[in-house]
């Protein structure tokens, strides 16, 4: 939520990511509870590949979680120009800035950019793929949890 204050153009993106993380985990825990599973990290073979990889390989899951947090911390630290002035070890090998244009929508940023010359920007570039996998796992978790809840509830409603 701190990032939504520091980057007002990204307010809805920041809030949506928090809602996705909390909502997908809550639904996963609730769905697993209804299935009498011992943990929300128990996944079936029929689950999405990304969820199986995420929950069966704890090192991979840890790397994704740490990568996501590092990216958020880097975005927070990037608001300080003194930190952004620290050159990274690959400053000459990378382009000065990498930008990805995004579709325009109110409350959402229109460009994702990273200053690659700074050490912080290079750290963010390393963390970005892990963050992306964690978000993909959250979406997959949300979908599978909703499907499981419907599968659990549908027979009861059909009988009623």
Language model feature labels by segment:
Residues 1-33:
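Multi-pass membrane catalytic core of lipid/isoprenoid biosynthesis enzymes
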């Amino acid at each position: 939520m701190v990032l939504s204050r520091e980057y007002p153009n990204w307010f809805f993106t920041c809030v949506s990511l928090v809602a996705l993380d909390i909502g997908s985990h809550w639904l996963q825990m609730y769905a697993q509870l209804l299935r009498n599973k011992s943990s929300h990290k128990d996944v079936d073979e029929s689950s999405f590949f990304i969820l199986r990889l995420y929950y069966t390989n704890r090192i991979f899951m840890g790397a994704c979680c740490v990568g996501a947090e590092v990216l958020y911390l880097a975005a927070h630290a990037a608001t300080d120009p003194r930190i952004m002035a620290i050159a990274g070890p690959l400053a000459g090998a990378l382009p000065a800035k990498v930008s990805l244009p995004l579709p325009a929508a109110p409350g959402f940023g229109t460009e994702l950019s990273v200053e690659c010359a700074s050490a912080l920007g290079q750290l963010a570039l390393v963390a970005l793929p892990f963050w992306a996998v964690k978000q993909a796992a959250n979406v997959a978790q949300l979908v599978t949890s909703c499907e499981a809840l419907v599968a659990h509830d549908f027979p009861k409603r059909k009988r009623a």
